Regions:
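Glycine-rich loops and low-complexity Gly/Arg-rich segments
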Residues: 30, 97-98, 183, 202-205, ...
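Short, charged, low-complexity patches
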Residues: 85, 199-208
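Short, gly/Ser/Thr-rich active-site loops of penicillin-recognizing serine hydrolases
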Residues: 114-122, 208-240
Length: 240
């Protein structure tokens, strides 16, 4: 099922999803364009078709436009900035609210008087999934973290997904981790990328540090010690 496929990073499951999208669940002949059209439709609903709104330069996202079987696991020519993945996982964490992003909380004058405040703005809401379907995704992302030794004995329940972004056969993959916590009632979502970082567990270790600081598990002095932690291992480490 989808929860187990997420938890085990099972490419075969999602290859099959991509193929089903291109064959209307096996009812028609394979149609690459039809499969890609469906992937683009859902990716757009989750905010992956445009920049997030932050007030700094941001690359335009690229939703895959070929090879739906590969695109279904994030390959093909999918291409996203880390913050775009951050908004994507935030939408998953809150069951479909896609927010306009901003770096600003408020603007003050030189005397500290508030001139303008910035409230959260919802770009759109994904209403094509029901609670059972959202919960299946949440369960799978929780299973991912339960398979990561990085989070052994971590006091906050985290849900997330590891990944490796491939750029060149001559350099290591980019290390990726997206997630949110607490699992049952999310307060924070996060996307981490280490350029050419080899394994997603390096990114997961960094994300754990952010969660640790946010939830007062460790303070800055403990975390910023100049030493890299052992990244640990996972039963799905070869499948990211």
């Amino acid at each position: 099922n989808v929860s187990e496929a997420l938890g085990d990073s099972c490419n075969y499951f999602f290859y099959d999803v991509g193929y089903r999208l291109a064959t209307n669940n096996f009812s028609t002949s394979y149609d690459d364009a039809a499969g890609i059209s469906k992937i683009q439709e859902y990716a757009s609903l989750l905010g992956l078709d445009e920049t997030t709104g932050v007030e700094i330069e941001e690359n335009d996202p690229q939703i895959a436009d070929e090879y739906p079987v590969m695109a279904a696991i994030g390959q093909s020519n999918n291409n996203y900035a880390t913050i775009q993945l951050g908004r994507y996982v935030s939408a998953i964490a809150n069951d479909g609210n896609v927010y306009e992003y901003t770096l600003l909380n408020k603007v003050c004058d030189s005397d500290g008087n508030t001139l303008e405040t910035f409230e959260p703005k919802v770009r759109n809401t994904v209403d094509v999934l029901d609670t059972t379907q959202w919960n299946a995704i949440h369960t799978g992302m929780r299973m991912v973290v339960e398979n990561l030794s990085t989070f052994d004995d971590f006091p906050i329940e985290v849900a997330g997904k590891t990944g490796t972004a491939q750029q060149s056969p001559n350099r290591p993959n980019h290390a990726l981790f997206v997630g949110y916590a607490p699992y049952s009632d999310p307060e924070i979502s996060i996307a981490t990328r280490i350029a050419f970082g080899y394994t997603s567990h390096n990114a997961a270790e960094y994300a754990k540090n952010v969660f640790s600081y946010y939830f007062d598990v460790q303070d800055a002095e403990e975390l910023l010690n100049g030493q890299a932690e052992n990244v640990g291992e996972s039963s799905n480490s070869f499948n990211d």
